Amino acid sequence: MKVHLDRTSSGFCIGVQGTIHLAEEKLEELDSKLYCLGDIVHNEVEVKRLEDLGLITIDNEEYNKLKHAHVLVRAHGEPPSTYKRADSNELSITDSTCPVVSKLQRTARLLFELGFQIIIYGKKTHPEVIGINGQCADQAVIIKHADLSVPEETDPIDFTRQTALISQTTMDVPGFYILKKNLESLFADRTDAAEQKSTHSWKTIRDIDITAEMTGICPLPDLVYKDTICRQVSSRNAKLHDFAAANDIIIFVAGKKSSNGQVLFNICRESNPRSYFIADQTGLQDEWFYDNGRPVGSVGVCGATSTPMWLLENVAHSIEQTYAG
């Protein structure tokens, strides 16, 4: 049995790497406690490792009561209200918001200030989406289902307003464009036939287009979209698909809360039905590794952007020691 560890399309993305590195630095240099608002990463094993080093995870209620303390803002980012509370409670903020998320927040804020209705492709309760929505005074329309199958998600849309479609950075690219197409049809259905072609043709925009609108040089169309999905994350999809197909079985390692983990695991399972989701090596099951009593030929170990490489290495080592010996 050969055990293959995916080192090219698994493990922390740059944003999470920066957050973990900053947390470790602060834990080493601070004499006082370091708090983190929410799980620093959606991986229970990594959270426990950092908590063992002294990191204290708190929720919003605890954060609002905290005073004169050091707080880490994780890669997902936070809404403006979090920073206002920090000022009023004299909190010292270490901001590790992912640069890709920071750019997205700025885009959402500028479009909202220009009067656009903001539609976010994402999950309403995901911390990144909460942060983006905060840039829009919590008035964004949030749609998780690209097929528009949930009326409660589309009911808040005002079809008379200028509208901008953006996305949570970790959503799937095909889903974003399916949503765009379905929204085009929905907007067309809600308007007069005479207006459909001219007013309700969706146009992609760049940062320079937003600047041009702000300065009055070139007004934006009524309906615009900006693909804000992180390509470092989405580019892993094809690589993981091929990796999964090249092995007899796949052991996918991720936290239960990881949105990206669910997306990537589904990609693995579509490519290889013998794909199994675990949090760590304790989740391994003997029957996965045998065909008619004989060991399988190859095992692929991979994971999410929130899965640390050290954990993937531990899982691969455990498989080698237990099943490949």
UniProtKB/Swiss-Prot annotation:
**Which cofactor(s) are needed, names only?**
[4Fe-4S] cluster
Pathway assigned in UniProt: Isoprenoid biosynthesis; dimethylallyl diphosphate biosynthesis; dimethylallyl diphosphate from (2E)-4-hydroxy-3-methylbutenyl diphosphate: step 1/1; Isoprenoid biosynthesis; isopentenyl diphosphate biosynthesis via DXP pathway; isopentenyl diphosphate from 1-deoxy-D-xylulose 5-phosphate: step 6/6
What EC numbers are recorded for this enzyme?
1.17.7.4
Q: Which GO terms describe its molecular function?
A: 4 iron, 4 sulfur cluster binding; 4-hydroxy-3-methylbut-2-enyl diphosphate reductase activity; metal ion binding
The UniProt record gives the binding positions of [4Fe-4S] cluster as: C13, C98, C230
Binding of dimethylallyl diphosphate, residues:
H42, H76, H126, S258, S259, N260, S306
Cofactor remark: Binds 1 [4Fe-4S] cluster per subunit.
Q: Which UniProt keywords apply?
A: 4Fe-4S, Iron, Iron-sulfur, Isoprene biosynthesis, Metal-binding, Oxidoreductase
Query: Its function?
Result: Catalyzes the conversion of 1-hydroxy-2-methyl-2-(E)-butenyl 4-diphosphate (HMBPP) into a mixture of isopentenyl diphosphate (IPP) and dimethylallyl diphosphate (DMAPP). Acts in the terminal step of the DOXP/MEP pathway for isoprenoid precursor biosynthesis.
At which positions is isopentenyl diphosphate bound?
H42, H76, H126, S258, S259, N260, S306
Q: What is this protein called?
A: 4-hydroxy-3-methylbut-2-enyl diphosphate reductase
Binding annotation for (2E)-4-hydroxy-3-methylbut-2-enyl diphosphate: H42, H76, H126, T169, S258, S259, N260, S306
List the GO biological process terms. Answer: dimethylallyl diphosphate biosynthetic process; isopentenyl diphosphate biosynthetic process, methylerythritol 4-phosphate pathway; terpenoid biosynthetic process
What's the catalysed reaction? Answer: isopentenyl diphosphate + 2 oxidized [2Fe-2S]-[ferredoxin] + H2O = (2E)-4-hydroxy-3-methylbut-2-enyl diphosphate + 2 reduced [2Fe-2S]-[ferredoxin] + 2 H(+); dimethylallyl diphosphate + 2 oxidized [2Fe-2S]-[ferredoxin] + H2O = (2E)-4-hydroxy-3-methylbut-2-enyl diphosphate + 2 reduced [2Fe-2S]-[ferredoxin] + 2 H(+)
Give, as one word, the top-level EC class: oxidoreductase
- Matching HAMAP family: IspH (MF_00191)
* Species of origin: Chlorobium phaeobacteroides (strain BS1)
Q: Which residues form a coiled coil?
A: none
* Family the UniProt entry places it in: Belongs to the IspH family.
By its UniProt entry, which InterPro entries does this protein fall under?
Answer: LytB/IspH
- UniProt cross-references to PANTHER family, sorted A to Z: 4-HYDROXY-3-METHYLBUT-2-ENYL DIPHOSPHATE REDUCTASE (PTHR30426:SF0)
Q: Identify the catalytic residues.
A: E128
